[in-house]
Amino acid sequence: MIEMQEAIKRLILHEGLKLKPYKCPAGYLTIGVGRNVETNPITEEEKKVVGDWERGITENGAKYLLKNDIMKAHKECKKYIEFYKTLDDERQYALLDMCFNLGIYGLLKFRKMLFAMEIGDYRGASKECLNSKYAKEVGKRAVRIARTIEKGVFSYD
């Protein structure tokens, strides 16, 4: 997997950073860097660091939650995507980003994309990523992720 600080930087680019609770486009109560507190509640352990999140959190608190969410997504990708560990760091990141955004079960619905990646057809996998409701909803994020899948290089443009 890519370095934690790089994953944080990229996910802040894609998700944004909000220190007060807000409703995400899907209508869920969210805070920090895309932490959906309805489906992924703040744990007691996390509350010790972030405090009363309903009143807002610090940037450090948001990054703490994000690190936990990145580790969770990475663990789920390793568990549910058999070939994940064989991918280079950038393509692992692409799947991690999608898992972070969609949840592992949302990512697993991309069967054709995942199959293409498993057999090394990264151009085909990229096309499958872009030919989806996900791509229409997240726009430039999906373009970056698809390009990363195809080329094995992440670009901030």
Task: Give, region by region, the residue ranges found by the protein language model.
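Short, surface-exposed acidic-centric catalytic microdomains
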Residues: 29-55
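N-terminal accessory alpha/beta regions
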Residues: 98-99
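Acidic helix-start/capping segments at beta-turn-to-alpha-helix junctions
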Residues: 90-92
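Long, amphipathic alpha-helical surface segments
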Residues: 1-20, 26-27, 35-39, 60-68, ...
